[in-house]
Design a protein with these regions (language model features):
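Helix-rich catalytic cores of soluble enzyme domains
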Residues: 1-81
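Acidic, glycine-enriched catalytic cores built around paired aspartates
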Residues: 53-215
Length: 215
């Protein structure tokens, strides 16, 4: 994301700006057991550390219970700091990762370029119009302005894919790539690719799995 941000900053004459990246720790269902909840927090922290995110939105071991206490918030922060500190000097390199990065870049370009087009060069205006048109679409977002038609699901290995891109303007080859990955999961699980996968994935981590499996 930082590479693409630098590209668009130069393209749009915003080179004197600083853009930060953020990782939100798991936003779905959390396990009620605090030890298991800390594992989920550590998992998200590890992703943030390896991705070199600028900041992290931290969860607590009380996510499944209700409003966290001050002490629970502090525990979540300490757990996150420890995990990030342990991985501060580590890098993840693999051909599979490079492929995923290339795909994410193409998907991002498709959305950002369309937003520029909708705004006729004005990205602020383009972003507003893109949200209204569903070009920028956030799954499960509570905002009344969000289009809310795009649906994600994990593939068999746990990567998040587009089950239904809706109005997100992905090139046909990327739509097919995403669907093929989900169809492979469906085949391995002996079921159809459907909205049930989305539901299963939302609750999977609270049940101790990354990918939601059928009963």
């Amino acid at each position: 994301m930082e590479e693409l941000t630098d590209f668009y900053k130069q393209k749009s004459a915003y080179e004197d700006t600083t853009v930060t990246t953020v990782l939100h720790q798991w936003m779905g269902g959390f396990p009620q057991d605090e030890a298991k909840a800390f594992a989920v927090i550590s998992w998200g922290s590890s992703v943030a550390a390896l991705a070199k995110a600028t900041k992290v939105i931290v969860k607590t071991p009380h996510e499944a219970i209700g409003v966290p206490t001050m002490e629970a918030n502090a525990q979540g922060l300490r757990c996150t700091k420890q995990a990030i500190s342990l991985l501060a000097d580590q890098e993840l390199k693999s051909s599979a990762l490079e492929l995923e990065k290339a795909i994410i870049k193409e998907e991002t370009r498709a959305i950002v370029d369309k937003s520029f087009e909708l705004g006729k060069g004005d990205l602020a205006l383009g972003a507003i119009r893109a949200v209204k048109a569903g070009v920028i679409d956030i799954p499960f977002a509570p905002s009344k302005y969000n289009y809310g038609k795009m649906l994600p699901a994990r593939d068999f290995e746990g990567a998040v894919r587009y089950l239904n891109p809706a109005h997100v303007p992905l090139p046909k080859e990327l739509v097919n790539y995403n669907l093929n990955k989900i169809e492979h999961r469906a085949k391995m699980e002996k079921r159809k690719a459907s909205f049930q996968m989305v539901i299963d994935d939302v609750y999977a981590i609270s049940k101790g799995r990354l990918v939601g499996k059928p009963k």
